[in-house]
A protein has these predicted regions:
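Long, contiguous binding/interaction regions
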Residues: 1-167, 174-175
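A structural-propensity feature for long, helix-poor, extended segments
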Residues: 205-213
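Conserved phosphate/anionic-ligand binding catalytic regions in large, soluble enzymes, centered on
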Residues: 1, 172-199
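Acidic, low-complexity proline/glycine-rich segments
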Residues: 160-164, 190, 201
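A broad, structure-centric signal for solvent-exposed, well-ordered loop/edge residues
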Residues: 100-102, 179, 209
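A generic structural micro-environment signature
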Residues: 51-54, 70, 178, 184, ...
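Short, well-ordered loop/turn and helix-capping segments at boundaries between secondary-structure elements
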Residues: 12, 85, 193, 197, ...
Length: 213
């Protein structure tokens, strides 16, 4: 019942208005006798909660119908807040099916900002932060290549960026016209940018430099 109440707090459809207690209070109706509804906190969000007897835990299932309006991490954070207020604790979460990369990138950046950490880290590291903070690996390992749409669709066999350094060098030295000067210059530039970012990240997290963040 408490899990369902949390879902009602957040979902767009909200709950039926009642006098006093949200669960047992008298239903408030309009002039035509129809129950009035109290909207939830988030647009484009459907949700329901129930208790799973065999596991001894409550679960809330959400369906985000527009991730550009309502973000996964905002729903997670608010769920944790409402659960704590009811004496419950969120122990983890699970994604069903595949998820757009943007969802986890946005979540990872959000949590990094909360931790006052640099956002200038590799994309997969940002996603890792999201996975660990959201508890997406609570039930089973979260494989980025299998669970994120963009990674799952990528053809790894024909992408230069997925080559090892040795294979890339060997390919460059072959009779093939590509990779050529452009690829080498781009990679050299990327290494320079990565090194500069490393220095910035080391400085940003240096003890005594918190006020310079």
């Amino acid at each position: 019942r408490r899990a369902n109440a949390i879902a009602f707090d957040l979902r767009e459809a909200g709950r039926i208005k009642r006098e006093g207690d949200n669960i047992s209070g008298k239903i408030i109706k309009d002039s035509n006798g129809n129950p009035l509804r109290q909207p939830g906190l988030f647009k484009n969000l459907k949700g329901i909660g129930w208790y799973i007897q065999e596991y001894g835990i409550a679960q809330i299932s959400y369906n985000l119908t527009n991730i550009n309006v309502t973000s996964l991490h905002d729903v997670f954070e608010k769920t944790c807040e409402r659960a704590t207020a009811r004496g419950l604790r969120v122990t983890g979460s699970e994604l069903i099916g595949l998820v757009p990369k943007k969802v986890l990138i946005d979540a990872g950046k959000y949590f990094l900002k909360k931790q006052s950490r640099s956002l200038a880290i590799p994309e997969r590291d940002i996603i890792y932060i999201a996975v660990k903070t959201l508890g997406l690996d609570e039930l089973q390992p979260f494989n980025q290549d299998e669970r994120i749409i963009e990674y799952a669709l990528k053809n790894k066999n024909n992408v230069l960026a997925n080559m090892t350094l040795i294979n890339f060098a060997n390919k460059t030295s072959s009779e093939s016209p590509a990779p050529g000067g452009g690829s080498i210059s781009a990679y050299t530039g990327a290494l320079g940018a990565a090194l500069s970012t490393m220095v910035a990240n080391l400085s940003a997290n240096k003890r005594g430099w918190d006020d310079k963040w």
